[in-house]
Amino acid sequence: MILLAELVVVVVASCVQGMTGFGFAVVAVPLLATLGGLDDAIAIAGLLGLWASINTIRSSHVDVHWPVVRSVLRGTAVGLPVGMYVVHLVDTRRLTVVTGVVVLALAAALLMGLQIRCTRPIAQGVTGVLSGTLGACTGMTGPPVVIALRGTDLSAAATRATLAVTLGTAGAAILAMRALTGHVHVRSLPVVALAVPLVWVGNRLGQWVFGRVTPAGYRAVVMLLLVVSGVAAIVPR
């Protein structure tokens, strides 16, 4: 029953990823952690989230805004080693909670009409530094990039595709770091192997949903995921 529940979680998370371009880990990690432990949840979500990102990119690569991708990933390349250093200096649980509170505060401000413009490469690079640092420390690469892209003039399709590339690349780097430090265990692999085709199914369903929502509906779902990521960071696992 636990395996079946894990596979259902994977389908739902893949659908969210296919619709929005991100969010696999936001959905999967808290739920998988309750079923099999946090380390396994992060490993499973990392491996399958990368596959989900690849599927999204394959179907939407023509919509990717490459100048934004380059600016953000340059910053991410700086932020990842910074995060690896910081993780040895601070209590990562406290940092995760603080990050969650900040994300919720920013989400509330955005919902109340705050405008954050992030159209210049330097601002997008700083976003990448924050994303990489937080990703290495807490696994939360998404919120800085999601908030930044909301402050650009990109369409919903371009936002979705650009999120998939930037966060998928950052996720791959973080997954490699976790594997090198012994945090990806063999016991996670059977679930991953069984779930690979289900990721494709969920991703395709999410793409179908994306094709039928309005830009305003897409932005609303993205904001909901932002709030969920903030809450998930605060709630103990």
Give the ranges of each region predicted by the language model.
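Small-residue-rich hydrophobic segments that form or flank transmembrane alpha-helices
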Residues: 3-70, 128, 132, 140-203
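Small-residue-mediated transmembrane helix hinge/kink sites in multi-pass secondary transporters
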Residues: 30, 83-88, 147, 207-208
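Helix-loop interface residues and adjacent transmembrane-helix termini in multi-pass membrane transporters
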Residues: 35, 63, 89-92, 153, ...
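Hydrophobic alpha-helical transmembrane segments in multi-pass integral membrane proteins
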Residues: 41, 83-88, 92-96, 135-140, ...
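Cytoplasmic-side transmembrane-helix entry/capping segments in multi-pass membrane proteins
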Residues: 65-76, 96-100, 119-130, 158-165, ...
